[in-house]
Amino acid sequence: ATNAAETVFTTAEATKAKAGDIIHIRSAWPGLDEVIARVKEASESSVTLEDINTLNTGDFAAGGGAGSFRVIKSWEEMSQITEVASSGGEQQSIQLQFLSDTTQRNVNTFKTARVQTYTIAHDSSLPFYDLLRQADSSQDTLAAYMFVPKAKENRYWSAKASFNDIPNTAVNTVETVTATLNLQSGLTAYK
């Protein structure tokens, strides 16, 4: 991969990716690894990633972006979602004070891992139950997608799934199950 405002992958073999395809990236660059992106342009030997900026050589070492990608061919809708709860992403810091200084400072370190928990109205006949069970068992990293109508935005990320298919049951409420997505990449959004 190149260091560019819109990253270009050169492929060793002919690619079947085309403009508009959504791809799941594996890269030696941690900031690009597991990212889900849209192909802006494609030729037989390269693809340009839309809005994926790798110019910062502090984060993306020149010549270090080797990897691979796969085209996402289909999506399975998780229907009957009643709630989505997000957690994580909080900035962590350490406090630092030098002996010669009278002021203590906070220094940012990392952000906590991000998690999305989906509460779903229980219906064991829904086709995505089996997909979530398989993803929970294999712990493969999957591409995830959400369209937000009011924002007119397609949102993509990768995640490892956990699925609790035992319904939460209470009087006079809809039974629910939970799917948890442990995010493996940041959000990529396209309008």
Short names for language-model regions:
Residues 1-4, 12-15, 29-105:
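Small/polar beta-strand repeat architecture
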Residues 12-30, 137-143:
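Short coil-to-beta transition motif at edge beta-strands of beta-rich domains
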Residues 22, 34-38, 46, 154-160, ...:
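Well-ordered beta-strand positions in beta-sheet-rich domains
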Residues 26, 128-158:
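Short, acidic/charged, Gly/Pro-enriched secondary-structure junctions
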Residues 63-64, 112, 138-140:
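Extracellular repetitive beta-rich solenoid segments
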Residues 104-110, 132-137, 148-150, 167-175:
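Exposed beta-sheet edge/beta-hairpin loop segments within beta-rich domains
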Residues 105-126, 173-188:
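Oligomerization/assembly interface segments of phage tail-like spikes and tubes
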